[in-house]
Regions:
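Conserved MFS/SLC helix-loop-helix module at the cytosolic interface between two early adjacent transmembrane helices
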Residues: 55-95
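Paired small-residue
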Residues: 80-87, 95-103, 303-311
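Helix-loop-helix hairpin linking two adjacent transmembrane segments in secondary transporters
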Residues: 96, 125-126, 130-179, 185, ...
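Juxtamembrane intracellular "pre-TM" segments in multi-pass secondary transporters
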Residues: 182-214
Length: 402
């Protein structure tokens, strides 16, 4: 596989999760109606069930890939994803749909864990950074265009057409893997699965104040993101009577998150992870409090919501990758297991918090905005816990690096 094809392949792997979530959003009302859901908020389970499967499976794929190799484990994950998509196409009840979506998440988790592992196997240093940067640029476009893809499908086909698209996406990736991706993990580098070793690594992760603090802070802000994703379609349709603007505004908000991620990549080496992420957290918290005040005063409209939400997502993009990196700093010697545990906790915890926010949707933006503010305060508390009450400190790292 040549360099360009490899970059596109990694980008496609990274995009699997985002497209499986964001393309669903315009179809949630139709799915709820077709499967006889009695409460509109319950349609959000289409998102949450996927996230729970995605989060839970992250805990196992790293160890499996280190033991059995990248290619075979990736093939299994993509097969689960594709078969689950077929199950969703033919789902005749909401319960079957939830099971199919959870299995989709289980399959998609393989792409999330293995994308970085495969790049690490094949490249190192600047070349690895170049591959990840190029793939990340492609990946950032997916949340921007995925809702519009879903909207186009439901305009010209039944909502099940979205799952046909996801099935084809998974099948193409599976065939691509089978035909073009060799095994990237050398046999001598394979490691046996050790319960004792995994338990020891978990103990190291949970014993680190910095790791636990940033893991929980990341869970809080992920909860806000998932709450927004869960209820965004209903907010535009019911709170603002502007369903026709949903995909456009959602894309614009996603652009701000993409821009902040690109900005972070440019400045973090010079400014430092802590300065960037702590400033972003304070900005995020300030915006959430302003937004809560706007809603409480009764002057909320689609423009105030969209502008303030874009500001929050901009801050989000400056926080999350840095929170993850700082959580990993003390446990780099058990990076694989630590990364799996971080992904498990932040995704499962964030999905559950986001589900609670979404289920409290009452036709207004009040639950979401006050939830954002509460989660922002808790994220600050956890960061202060990690940093022993001090923000912007470098912990003795080289200047501009932390």
């Amino acid at each position: 596989m040549g360099f360009r094809q490899f970059v596109v392949f990694i980008a496609a792997m990274m995009a699997t999760n985002a497209i499986a979530i964001d393309s669903m959003l315009p179809a949630l009302p139709e799915i709820g109606h077709a499967l006889a859901i009695d409460t509109a908020n319950h349609a959000q389970w289409v998102i949450t069930a996927y996230l729970l499967g995605f989060g839970a499976a992250q805990i196992i794929y790293g160890s499996l890939a280190d033991r059995f190799g990248r290619r075979s484990v990736l093939m299994v994950g993509l097969a689960i994803y594709t078969l689950a998509s077929i199950g969703a196409i033919f789902a005749g009840s909401f319960e079957v749909m939830m099971a199919a979506r959870a299995l989709q998440g289980v399959g998609s988790a393989a792409t999330r864990i293995l994308a970085v592992a495969i790049v690490r196997d094949c490249y190192s240093g600047r070349q690895m950074a170049r591959v990840m940067s190029l793939a990340f640029i492609v990946f950032l476009s997916v949340p921007i265009i995925a809702p519009s893809i879903g909207q186009l499908i439901v305009l010209f086909a039944p909502w099940r057409g979205i799952f046909v698209m996801l099935c084809l996406f998974g099948a193409v990736l599976m065939v691509w893997t089978w035909l073009r991706l060799p095994e990237t993990l050398h046999p001598e580098d394979r490691t046996p699965i050790s319960v004792a070793g995994i338990s020891h690594a978990f103990g190291l992760v949970l014993g680190s104040r910095i790791t636990v603090g940033y893991m929980l802070a990341m869970t809080m802000v992920m909860g806000g993101l998932f709450g927004f994703i869960n209820s965004s379609q209903q907010i535009f349709a019911d709170a603002f009577d502007a369903a026709h603007l949903f995909t456009i505004v959602f894309a614009l908000i996603a652009v701000f998150m993409a821009l902040s991620s690109l900005l972070n990549a440019r400045i973090v080496g010079r400014v430092g992870m802590r300065r960037v992420s702590h400033a972003a957290l304070l900005g995020y918290l300030a915006i959430t409090l302003v937004h809560a005040g706007v809603v409480a005063s009764g002057v909320e409209n689609i423009w105030t919501f969209s502008i303030l939400q874009a500001g929050m997502m901009f801050c989000f993009g400056l926080m999350v990758s840095n929170f993850n990196s700082m959580a990993m700093e003390p446990v780099g010697h058990v990076a694989g297991t630590a990364s799996s545990l971080l992904g498990f906790v932040s995704t499962i915890g964030g999905a559950l918090l986001g589900f609670v926010l979404g289920q409290n949707f009452d036709g207004t933006t009040l639950p979401l905005t006050f939830g954002f503010a509460a989660f922002g305060v808790m994220a600050l508390v956890f960061v202060l816990f990690a940093e022993k009450g001090r923000l912007f400190s470098s912990h003795g790292a080289p200047a501009g690096r932390s």
